Regions:
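Extreme N-terminal, non-catalytic leader segments
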Residues: 1-36
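Walker A (P-loop) phosphate-binding loop of P-loop NTPases
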Residues: 42
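Conserved lysine of the Walker
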Residues: 45
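Hydrophobic positions on the alpha1 helix immediately C-terminal to the Walker A/P-loop
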Residues: 48
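Post-Walker A helix-loop "phosphate-sensing" segment adjacent to the P-loop in P-loop NTPases
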Residues: 54-64
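Conserved nucleotide-sensing/catalytic segment adjacent to the nucleotide-binding pocket
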Residues: 64, 73-122
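ATP-dependent NMP and nucleoside kinases share a basic, alpha-helical "lid"
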Residues: 122-183
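Small-molecule kinase domains that catalyze NTP-dependent phosphoryl transfer to phosphate-bearing small molecules
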Residues: 128, 151-154, 182-230
Length: 230
């Protein structure tokens, strides 16, 4: 029987975890398995990560999904131009994201890790808004630029076990991106949503499509079939 794409990805993660070396030999503990999933606005990172998490947990491993949106730089530190395109790569604290991934890499099940979160309603970061639980064995880290080839982001790829990129066609990304702006209350009308995407979102998606590091899997998420390319 042919495996579905989410099950295939989950099986890869579980295999990585069980095949990882026992770095902490004295306590016989495997380190956490880390997966980075990148993709532009409207690519479906959150949906894919959620499906994979559920299937990983069905196989007996505790899995959590975290976002890097909590690492947005404070508004006071941004120029007017940056405020207008908040969410672009230069409005995120890339060094802090890199340190977060390193901390997760060095941590072991049995240790909790506190991370900043992001409130979708207020559009503000939340200190300690995300907590990796002590018994978590797999962490899926999602972020638009998590696998960008710009410094310091490009160092992240060497710290994770799996690197996935979600690709969508431009017209699909535009429709989904505009819908996200509406659903999150960033704009009030469909016309404003498409205008914002054409002024901001399209450049974000072009950037990540052109400036991402080498990945292990490309996920083409243009419809419900979600084909994979290794």
């Amino acid at each position: 029987m042919r495996l579905g794409p989410y099950q295939y990805l989950a099986d890869m993660v579980v295999m990585h975890y069980h095949n990882s070396s026992l770095n902490d030999v004295e306590n016989k503990q495997r380190r956490r398995c880390l997966v980075a999933i990148a993709g532009g606005l409207g690519s479906g990172k959150s949906t894919i990560a959620g499906h994979v998490r559920d299937r990983v947990e069905e196989q007996g491993l505790k899995c959590q999904v975290v976002t890097v949106e909590g690492f947005l730089r404070p508004r006071a530190d941004l120029s007017e131009e940056q405020l207008n395109k908040r969410g672009a790569i230069d409005t995120l604290d890339g060094d802090a994201v890199l340190h977060m991934v390193q901390d997760l890499r060095d941590s072991r099940p049995g240790e909790d890790v506190h991370l900043p979160g992001f409130d979708e309603h207020t559009r503000e970061t939340v200190p300690d808004g995300q907590v990796i639980q002590p018994d978590t064995q797999v962490v899926i880290i999602k972020g638009t630029y998590i696998l960008a080839n710009a410094q310091p982001w490009r160092k992240i790829g060497g710290l994770v076990d799996e690197r996935w990129f979600v690709f969508v066609m431009p017209d699909v990304a535009r429709e989904r991106g505009a819908r996200q702006y509406l659903d999150k209350g960033i704009v009030g009308t469909e016309e404003e949503a498409f205008r914002r995407y054409d002024e901001i979102g399209v450049y974000t998606n072009k950037y990540v499509n052109r400036h991402s590091c080498r990945v292990d899997v490309v996920i083409e998420n243009n419809d419900d079939t979600v084909p994979l390319t290794e």
